[in-house]
């Protein structure tokens, strides 16, 4: 039986389009993503509040304190404290500082923006990154031994220090106090005198 010409043409066109679509959607590779969700739960005690927002106030410094790229100044400690952790909680609880709009992947530090942060009413995070980026300076997050915690790196390579739980007063639950540093850090360009603000989100990582 012969197939009519027009029908044969339609079949050929369909086959050609299918081949083109298949080629257009061909993959160059595959990303396999894995993870683990634990039923371990702790309560974030500090920073408190519904959004667990902590304001770390760096000291007012002279721009002359930041001369060469990588120079740090104004190191300021801050804590993230957990409570009501289960007694079975293991050692090495730490913060994972999440990548976000303020992350500079080329330096591993946080972009700083020329603005004053307000707490009442609270400045919206989107307003921070909408401000003009500060020149010549960023903000670095470090461990207490001053080793850099690399922003934009994954949890395994970020190098944030882990902390061990302690028995909570008056019970068997545990508390964890994580201690880190924030500081100014010199980057390319001349440092401009101005107020600066930046931010970074964090997640608690359990052993």
Curated annotation (Swiss-Prot):
Belongs to the fimbrial protein family. It is found in: Fimbrium. This is Serotype 2 fimbrial subunit. GO terms for cellular component: pilus. It comes from Bordetella pertussis (strain Tohama I / ATCC BAA-589 / NCTC 13251). Residues 1-26 form the signal peptide. The lineage of its organism: Bacteria, Pseudomonadati, Pseudomonadota, Betaproteobacteria, Burkholderiales. Disulfide bonds join 42-85. It comes from the Bacteria. SUPFAM superfamilies: Bacterial adhesins (SSF49401). Keywords: Disulfide bond, Fimbrium, Signal. Gene3D superfamilies: Fimbrial-type adhesion domain. The gene is fim2. Bordetella pertussis is the causative agent of whooping cough. An essential step in the disease process is the attachment of the bacteria to the ciliated epithelium of the respiratory tract, enabling the organism to resist normal host-clearance mechanisms. It is unclear which bacterial cell surface component are responsible for adherence but the fimbriae of B.pertussis are prime candidates for being involved in this process. GO terms for biological process: cell adhesion involved in single-species biofilm formation.
């Amino acid at each position: 039986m012969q197939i009519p010409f027009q029908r044969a043409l339609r079949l050929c066109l369909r086959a050609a389009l299918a081949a083109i679509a298949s080629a257009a959607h061909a993959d160059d590779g595959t990303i396999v993503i894995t993870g683990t969700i634990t039923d371990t739960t702790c309560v974030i005690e500090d920073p408190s509040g519904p959004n667990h927002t902590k304001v770390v106030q760096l000291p007012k410094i002279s721009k002359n304190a930041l001369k060469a790229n990588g120079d740090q100044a104004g190191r300021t400690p801050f804590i993230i404290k957990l409570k009501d952790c289960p007694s079975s909680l293991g050692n090495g609880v730490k913060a994972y500082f999440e990548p976000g709009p303020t992350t500079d992947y080329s330096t591993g530090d946080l972009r700083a923006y020329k603005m004053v942060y307000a707490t009442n009413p609270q400045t919206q995070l989107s307003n921070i990154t909408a401000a003009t980026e500060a020149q010549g300076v960023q903000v670095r997050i470090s461990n207490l031994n001053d080793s850099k915690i690399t922003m934009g790196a994954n949890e395994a390579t970020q190098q944030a220090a882990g902390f061990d739980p302690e028995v909570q007063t008056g019970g068997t639950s545990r508390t964890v106090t994580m201690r880190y540093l924030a500081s100014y850090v010199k980057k390319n360009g001349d440092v401009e005198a101005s107020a600066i603000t930046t931010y970074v989100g964090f997640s608690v990582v359990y052993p």
